[in-house]
Amino acid sequence: MLRKLSPAVFVGVFLVLGNAAAGEWQTLEKCRLAPDQYMDGDSFHVLHEGKNHIFRLYFVDCPETDTSVPKRIADQMEDFGLAKDTAVVAAGQKAKEFTKKFLAGQFMVLTKWEDARGNSQQPRNYAVIFVGKKNLAEELVRSGHARAFGMPADYPDASRVKSFKDGLRRLQANAIRQKVGAFTGTSRGLAPTETAVPEREYVDYESEIGGQILQEGLNGLSIDFN
């Protein structure tokens, strides 16, 4: 007899296979931030035509709002030049408030429905967000509430991806020099000749979280074929 799979296993399998659904860019107009739902600076619930979606920003990473992912917290402490994990969390709360205010009205979502994993039981997908002509990712980095370090995408098109990412790295360098946002109390400095922060290879912490959920589900699975 085949025993019933636990909900955690179903979620884990979905997270692993979710990228198969990713395709062409789609535009969702007249979106709104879902009220009274979990969010942080770069991940939030969005309402569109009566449906609730969770989106995670491409290209950037905001400080965490809790310490549940120690590897990411440690990496953010170094990148933002913060001495304590509590400073990261405090900066994460400010990034959250920035995004909440930025998305107070209607906005546009561009997505390929690429799986962003995470630890929610609801599917989460990567996206680019616009309010008018303003790109949320760019504004977060400009204000020092995010770093130019995140899942890349072929946006705005394959030929211009590098210039877009280079622009984000220049915005981060400006935020460090101006000591704004998470860089207000930073110990990080830049040489006078540095016009952009160094490019870093992306580390997919989202996959690690999804893998942990799947493994937890598999560890609790018992199957009897007799």
Predicted regions mapped to residue ranges:
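Bacterial N-terminal signal peptides that target proteins for export
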Residues: M1-V9
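Bacterial N-terminal signal peptides
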Residues: A8-V16
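Small beta-barrel nucleic-acid-binding modules, primarily SNase/OB-fold domains
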Residues: N19-N226
